[in-house]
Amino acid sequence: MNERVLSLLSMCMQAKEKGHHVFFDYSPHVDRGQVAISVYKNGWKEDVDPDKRFIVTISGEVGYGKSSFAEVEAYLKELLA
């Protein structure tokens, strides 16, 4: 799973080149670890909610309020296209 987490981080950083701000927050203290990703299309603005939010568990488990790696990867790839 570490490779997939690094891939998500890389895509978040690439989004900046396209004018988007994608925040990547790793939380190791949560059971099994998780990554929260917040997407601001066309850049972050004060007092504006993100266009999209994802929470992915490092183990890849999907449950209520959690996204799969595949879902987040597909969204970010589309954002980078």
Regions found by a protein language model. Give the residues of each.
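Negatively charged, low-complexity tracts enriched in Asp/Glu with abundant Ser/Thr
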Residues: 1-36, 42-81
